[in-house]
Amino acid sequence: MSDLPDTDFTQRFIFDERDVRGEWVSLDDSYAAVLARHEYPQPVKALLGELMAATALLVGAMKFDGLLILQARSAGPIPLLMVECSSDCEIRGMARYEAEQIPADASLSQLMPDGHLTLTIDPVKGQRYQGTVDLDGANLSECFTNYFIQSQQLNTRFWLNAEGGKARGLLLQQLPRDRQPDDEEREDSWQHVVALAKTLKPEEWAEGNETLLHRLYHEDAVRLFDIQPLRFNCSCSRERSGNALVSLGEHDAKALVEECGGTVEIDCQFCNERYFFDASDVAQLFAGGGTDVASETRH
């Protein structure tokens, strides 16, 4: 089989003779779309790409209808990394950073000291779920692995990479007892697939998923499922920005317009699109007329 030409997708796979499943993610165009909207230093680009890969892997592994949000926060040079991915596989991401404090060779603990990772599942129907753990690991791959150690009974490992404008990720997870009823056999099998994944070299991540999986597990019966395409999309809109003004209340919204010299600018932190509202726009909002799509919007 030839490598798939798609650049942005997740693909699940399973070991037919082991109680182990996996998932691969490839992000080229969507990662590039995020980076094109901001001038991030290289360490920020890399961490944001890794977080995008992890988010896509989690969406691919879960069955829900809604939005998954990952936030990494700290009091350090990178106070925030944030990625959102919907069950429709639309992804966006952003970061906040202190430019003068970003050395090129800084470690995760230096860039995000005393950080924590928050996972939020916001379903279309049902109750919202949120879990927070410390950023415990030398890199984001270790942090996500440790997150799952604390939150799930099944062994789970992450490998994340974002270099050369490409974001990649690999997830391995031990399945409930089925093909391998013996405890020792299950543990040996798990350690075997993990040990092979650890041999991945940085330069190999850019290779096709099927080539890489064959190189790692050519002695195993590995079954690939259909790919799930991903794409960049920002959910911001003039309507949502107008709703943010409405939430302030009419008096405060009008006062804000005056304080801003007659026009309020609302910027999307994800895609950098800017929405402008003057006094007549705000009056229309509170008169129940909604937002005027023809009003000025800038990139």
From Swiss-Prot:
* Protein name as catalogued: 33 kDa chaperonin
Question: What is one Pfam family matched by this protein?
Answer: HSP33
Cystine bridges: 234-236, 268-271
**UniProt-recorded Gene Ontology molecular function terms:** protein folding chaperone; unfolded protein binding
Query: Which UniProt keywords are listed?
Result: Chaperone, Cytoplasm, Disulfide bond, Redox-active center, Zinc
Domain of life, per lineage: Bacteria
Q: Name one GO biological process term.
A: protein refolding
Principal cellular location given in the protein's record: cytoplasm
| UniProt PTM comment | Under oxidizing conditions two disulfide bonds are formed involving the reactive cysteines. Under reducing conditions zinc is bound to the reactive cysteines and the protein is inactive.
